[in-house]
Design a protein with these regions (language model features):
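Short, compact, well-ordered microdomains
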Residues: 58-101
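Short structural boundary motif marking the start of a folded domain
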Residues: 2-8
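Hydrophobic residues positioned within well-ordered beta-strands of beta-sheet architectures
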Residues: 6, 41, 94-96
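Solvent-exposed loop and beta-edge segments used for protein-protein assembly and interaction
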Residues: 2, 35, 88-92
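Short, flexible N-terminal segments of the mature chain
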Residues: 22-45
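Short, Lys/Arg- and Gly-enriched loop/turn segments at beta-strand edges
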Residues: 46-57
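A structural detector for beta-sheet-dominated domains
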Residues: 9-11, 42, 99-101
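Short, structured beta-strand/loop micro-motifs enriched in basic residues and often containing a Trp
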Residues: 10, 15-25
């Protein structure tokens, strides 16, 4: 089976300080992903240095793109071999563009 590489690009990073102040316990280390940062997934595997929480949110889409699948949710993306996925951090979500390459 042919497996494609998938490029993962951090597109946007939000920071909801009001929600953090109201609900979050103080933490030592926050997300260090930078907008524009990229990773390449080979064979649908988690790239080195990828945030585990972000990977958990996106891995099913990365694996599907790596297998050549696409057109998620019946035409959701202009490029059928891509997806826009956000990590599951409700205080500092990052939006990632996944693209089959």
């Amino acid at each position: 089976m042919i497996m494609y590489d998938v490029k993962i690009t951090a597109q946007r990073k939000a920071d909801y300080k009001d929600l953090q102040a109201k609900y979050e316990n103080p933490i030592e280390h926050t997300c260090d992903v930078q907008e524009g940062q990229t990773w390449i997934s080979h064979d649908g595997m988690c790239p080195e240095g990828m945030c585990e929480s972000a990977w958990e949110s996106m891995h099913k889409f990365v694996e599907a793109l790596a297998r050549g699948e696409g057109d998620f949710y019946d035409g959701w993306m202009r490029n059928p071999y891509s997806a826009m996925i956000s990590c599951n951090d409700g205080f500092r979500p990052v939006s990632f563009l996944l693209e089959r390459i």
